[in-house]
Amino acid sequence: MIQFLQGQVVTVTKNIQNRWFLILSVNGVGYELQVPHSLAQQWTPPPPEPQQVFTHLLVRQDQIALFGFGRLAERDLFGQLMGVTGIGAQLAIALIETLGLEGLVQAVVTGNVKQLCQTPGVGKKGAERLALELKTKLSQWHKLQMGTGETDSTLPTTALLEDLEMTLLALGYTQTEIQQAIAMVSQVPDVAQSEDPEVWIRQAIGWLSDH
């Protein structure tokens, strides 16, 4: 299996179905990869220096496709999503595009169906199934990604999370900024053990102010 490719980004394009592709030249061979919108934006225009892309090769009876990601964790999460009943490659990449790595893991682990439904093509039943099938797996996977052993970040409950998101959105922060802040402050022991929304809000605002 191809784990990653390293080469020159030649072109970045969007097709009529709003899917993003890039051509990566590796030792004289041009590889076409479908990539998330965020990576396409990052490499538009194509950077002059060689780039590394983590890949997932999809082989089906009627299709062979290569998907590319800027982060190894994104590639691994894509593979996890593909194992869920009813989640194909396009819906998996849409989930990553819409919620981002941290936001998607957080939504699944906390069972935040409302947040998962923000992704086009994901309904309530699909979101519930996604959370049900992946909650335990992603909790364990998240611990490994964080590189910790016995201790790890603890994500807020769904109700607390909704209060936190609404407050930060009202203060003008974007969904991406909010997801990043929650992922970071959830690693602070005093915050992780608290069920007080004010504690989470104060820490999140503090982190956002410094970044």
Curated annotation (Swiss-Prot):
Region: Flexible linker, residue numbers: 150-158
Annotated Pfam families: HHH_5, RuvA_C, RuvA_N
Chain segments carrying region Domain II: 71-149
Key words of the record: Cytoplasm, DNA damage, DNA recombination, DNA repair, DNA-binding
Gene Ontology cellular component terms for the protein in this record: cytoplasm; Holliday junction helicase complex; Holliday junction resolvase complex
Region ranges (Domain I): 1-70
GO biological process: DNA recombination; DNA repair; SOS response
Keyword field contains Ribosomal protein: no
Stretches for region Domain III: 158-211
GO terms of molecular function: ATP binding; four-way junction DNA binding; four-way junction helicase activity
UniProt remark on domains: Has three domains with a flexible linker between the domains II and III and assumes an 'L' shape. Domain III is highly mobile and contacts RuvB.
Subunit organization: Homotetramer. Forms an RuvA(8)-RuvB(12)-Holliday junction (HJ) complex. HJ DNA is sandwiched between 2 RuvA tetramers; dsDNA enters through RuvA and exits via RuvB. An RuvB hexamer assembles on each DNA strand where it exits the tetramer. Each RuvB hexamer is contacted by two RuvA subunits (via domain III) on 2 adjacent RuvB subunits; this complex drives branch migration. In the full resolvosome a probable DNA-RuvA(4)-RuvB(12)-RuvC(2) complex forms which resolves the HJ.
More about this protein: This bacterium is considerably more resistant to UV and gamma irradiation than E.coli; the E.coli-like SOS regulon model is not an appropriate model for DNA repair in this cyanobacterium.
Entry function: The RuvA-RuvB-RuvC complex processes Holliday junction (HJ) DNA during genetic recombination and DNA repair, while the RuvA-RuvB complex plays an important role in the rescue of blocked DNA replication forks via replication fork reversal (RFR). RuvA specifically binds to HJ cruciform DNA, conferring on it an open structure. The RuvB hexamer acts as an ATP-dependent pump, pulling dsDNA into and through the RuvAB complex. HJ branch migration allows RuvC to scan DNA until it finds its consensus sequence, where it cleaves and resolves the cruciform DNA.
Family annotation (NCBIfam families): ruvA (TIGR00084)
The name this protein goes by in its record: Holliday junction branch migration complex subunit RuvA
